[in-house]
Amino acid sequence: MMSKGVLVGVVTDARRDKTVKVSVYRMVHHKVYKKIVKKCRIYSVHDEHNRCKRGDVVKIREHIPVSATKRWIVVDS
């Protein structure tokens, strides 16, 4: 079990300097159709040392705002 504010996702875009986009998938139960649905959310994440590459599985953590859209940082890559 992970602590609050820590997520695991896959790096989908690593073209910008010190910023990566991470897709976090979760399974939710659909109320109407009574089926399990896969939901995805994409986060802009601060990567201070540009270590992450596309396809890496990373652990991200909530952080104080680094920019207008970045409120997460890479913990483990």
UniProtKB/Swiss-Prot annotation:
GO CC term (a single one): cytosolic small ribosomal subunit
UniProt record, GO biological process: translation
Stored SUPFAM superfamilies: Nucleic acid-binding proteins
InterPro entries xrefs: NA-bd_OB-fold, Ribosomal_uS17, Ribosomal_uS17_bact/chlr
Xref: CDD domains: Ribosomal_uS17
Keyword hit for rRNA-binding: yes
Keywords assigned by UniProt, alphabetized: Ribonucleoprotein, Ribosomal protein, RNA-binding, rRNA-binding
Pfam families: Ribosomal_S17
Similarity remark: Belongs to the universal ribosomal protein uS17 family.
HAMAP family listed in its UniProt record: Ribosomal_uS17_B (MF_01345_B)
Subunit comment: Part of the 30S ribosomal subunit.
Functional description taken from the UniProt entry: One of the primary rRNA binding proteins, it binds specifically to the 5'-end of 16S ribosomal RNA.
Protein name: Small ribosomal subunit protein uS17
Naturally occurring in which organism (per UniProt): Anaplasma marginale (strain St. Maries)
Gene: rpsQ
